[in-house]
Amino acid sequence: MGSAFSQRMYDSSGLQIGRVDSERYYDSSGRQIGRVDGFTIYDASGRQIGRIDGNHVHNSSGSQVGRIDGERLYSASGTQMGRIDGDRIYDGSGRQIGRAEGLRPMQIIIYFYFFM
């Protein structure tokens, strides 16, 4: 059963770049590009491409690719890659790069690390 609404991702110019519906990730044309099942991340063909471990995200080799600390997104090396402020998404230099509508921080980090 799907959710009552889709959660949407927009770029900095306001164009919709994707959406998430019931933990399935879609691109701007509506094509499914991946999904999350429990703590495992899959691409559109069903191949495991990552996993979630608490606030950490790992690639298919098990290497940490990022983590969330509050509203801040960090790379595996600890560099701040971005932050979320309300519905706005900023890169590491503070420039707004997009907007999320109804997405949790973990959904945003999954979208950016695996599907962009």
Q: For each predicted feature, which ranges?
A:
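Long terminal segments
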Residues: 1-23, 27-32, 38-39, 45-48, ...
